[in-house]
């Protein structure tokens, strides 16, 4: 058994122990050789050979056992040292790895914050771009709507703000036909008030300016039969009285029924504005009253 095979992987203490064992084995071999070479009695030596062989076998077994024990001890120590060294390295590496992981986690959080900021900035840019696009697309529509909505308002305001001079000029330039139509469309309340406020002189003139044709027709439409019957049945005395009483009434009526020549002259002298107003405001009631008063 050669113990030099283990020297490459054994510590110094184990190496010194193994060298001492080798020295002991060499000494034993040396003494054996000298014993066999010496001039001692061969019988004693031969008798002892059997014992020596047994002792050598025992020594070999002992050495083998010792070597095995030493090897086991050395290997166990080596295993323990290696394991301890490995564990130390592992623990150191783990601690270092924890620091590295902690640093990496901090870096990751910073990266996440940066990414969030970038996303927010991108969203803001997108929003700005969208608003600009919508403003570009909406501006012409709003302009058209505002023009459509502002035009009638401006027209109304301009109509209201028309200078009164222009309105007066337009009123002066209105055709007489429109004036007559407006006079005809005057409300009945105003016509009634105007009729009430008409001076009595004008009413007399209007009565005088009543068409002579109507008065003549009313006189002609008086029933001749009634007049003849009344004249026949009335006594002569009553006829005289009735003639006396009727004469002033008829004279008044005849005054109203002045010849058409005079009425035409009076109509010519009447102002055209008053004639138009009076013709429009004349009610049918005075004609009926005149018809009633004309009857005998």
Swiss-Prot record:
Keyword entries, A-Z: Malaria, Repeat
Sequence repeat copies, ranges: 132-143, 144-155, 156-167, 168-179, 180-191, 192-203, 204-215, 216-227, 228-239, 240-251, 252-263, 264-275, 276-287, 288-293
Annotated stretches, region: 13.5 X 12 AA approximate tandem repeats of E-E-T-Q-K-T-V-E-P-E-Q-T: 132-296
Region (Disordered): 133-296
Record field: compositional bias (Basic and acidic residues): 181-271
Membrane-crossing segments per the record: none
Biased composition, class Polar residues, residue ranges: 277-296
Protein name per the record: 110 kDa antigen
């Amino acid at each position: 058994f050669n113990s030099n095979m283990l020297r490459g992987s054994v510590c110094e203490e184990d190496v010194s122990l193994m060298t001492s064992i080798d020295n002991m084995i060499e000494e034993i071999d040396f003494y054996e050789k000298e014993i066999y070479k010496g001039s001692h009695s061969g019988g004693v030596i031969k008798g002892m050979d059997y014992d020596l062989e047994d002792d050598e076998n025992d020594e070999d077994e002992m050495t083998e056992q010792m070597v095995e024990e030493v090897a086991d001890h050395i290997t166990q120590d080596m295993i323990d040292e290696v394991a301890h060294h490995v564990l130390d390295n592992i623990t150191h590496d783990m601690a270092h790895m924890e620091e590295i992981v902690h640093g990496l986690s901090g870096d990751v959080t910073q990266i996440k914050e940066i990414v969030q900021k970038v996303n927010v900035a991108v969203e803001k840019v997108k929003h700005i771009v969208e608003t600009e696009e919508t403003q570009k697309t909406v501006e012409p529509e709003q302009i058209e709507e505002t023009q459509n909505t502002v035009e009638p308002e401006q027209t109304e305001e301009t109509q209201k703000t028309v200078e009164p001079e222009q309105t007066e000029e337009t009123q002066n330039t209105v055709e007489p036909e429109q004036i007559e139509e407006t006079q005809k469309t005057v409300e009945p309340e105003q016509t009634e008030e105007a009729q009430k406020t008409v001076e009595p002189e004008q009413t007399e003139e209007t009565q005088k300016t009543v068409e002579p044709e109507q008065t003549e027709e009313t006189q002609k439409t008086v029933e001749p039969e009634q007049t003849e019957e009344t004249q026949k049945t009335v006594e002569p005395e009553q006829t005289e009285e009735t003639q006396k009483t009727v004469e002033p009434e008829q004279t008044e009526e005849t005054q109203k029924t002045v010849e058409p020549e005079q009425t035409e002259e009076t109509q010519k002298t009447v102002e055209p504005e008053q004639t138009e107003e009076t013709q429009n405001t004349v009610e049918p009631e005075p004609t009926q009253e005149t018809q009633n008063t004309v009857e005998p």
